Amino acid sequence: MAAKVITFMAVMVVTAFTANAKIPGVYTGGPWINAHATFYGEADASGTMGGACGYGNLYSQGYGVNTAALSTALFNNGLSCGSCFELKCINDPGWCLPGNPSILITATNFCPPNFNQASDNGGWCNPPREHFDLAMPMFLSIAKYKAGIVPVSYRRIPCRKKGGIRFTINGFKYFNLVLVTNVAGAGDVIKVSVKGSNTQWLDLSRNWGQNWQSNALLVGQSLSFRVKTSDGRSSTSNNIAPSNWQFGQTYSGKNFRV
């Protein structure tokens, strides 16, 4: 049910620097809201890899099976990528698991609308519905398989991630495509800037998902990155990519406090 997007290119992960420092302030999340949930992929969540956020292999990126594709109303044209939610199945004792356990997930994909079907009969992700298409293991953690679709209550929560924000630099000489992953706190990045050792701070434009681009010539310079999330907080990671950085490498910077 969720859209699949082929990742831009395979990357070689090189951890050049890891900063354990945290940014002052804490993202507090949001109120409980009613929605619905379905599932996609297989029992091992292999069908959820890739996706419209550009994260690629969700296992190697640290997201695992705790993921979901969001409907148009929640996806925000990709700006919601990386945001974290708590969900629980409600008001359906025949299909919800006993005790109404909750799950914690990260938004990694887009659940496209299906206007050939009514929004209450197959077009679950049609706007203005707020809907979560969960990785199968997550759905089975709150409801029975045969339910197919269940009512849920959800809320935004702070993202808890291990290590720093990761910056994977893809592209070529005059096209830098930076994938931003593993963001704690609010999780959803709304602005990315880069500074070479010979440049001022340069704002990147969002290409798709959480891939951000710059056409500046940055090869041969050490790089610093600044990330701003939807709660208004910023994280600056200075000189995390050395002057001999290569395309396809990943560098780890300063994360947000949780």
Curated annotation (Swiss-Prot):
Main subcellular location: secreted
Signal peptide span: 1-21
Residue span(s) of domain Expansin-like EG45: 50-164
Pfam families assigned to the protein according to its UniProt record, in alphabetical order: DPBB_1, Expansin_C
A single BP term in Gene Ontology: plant-type cell wall loosening
InterPro entries given in the database record: Expan_Lol_pI, Expansin, Expansin/allergen_DPBB_dom, Expansin_CBD, Expansin_CBD_sf, RlpA-like_DPBB, RlpA-like_sf
Ranges for domain Expansin-like CBD: 174-253
Keyword terms: Cell wall, Cell wall biogenesis/degradation, Disulfide bond, Membrane, Secreted, Signal
Cysteine disulfide partners in this protein: C53-C81, C84-C159, C89-C96
Annotated CDD domains: DPBB_EXPA_N
Subcellular location: Secreted, Cell wall; Membrane
GO cellular-component term (any): extracellular region
Membrane disposition: Peripheral membrane protein
PROSITE patterns given in the database record: EXPANSIN_CBD, EXPANSIN_EG45
Family per record: Belongs to the expansin family. Expansin A subfamily.
Stated role: Causes loosening and extension of plant cell walls by disrupting non-covalent bonding between cellulose microfibrils and matrix glucans. No enzymatic activity has been found.
Name listed for the protein in its UniProt record: Expansin-A9
Organism: Arabidopsis thaliana
Gene (UniProt): EXPA9
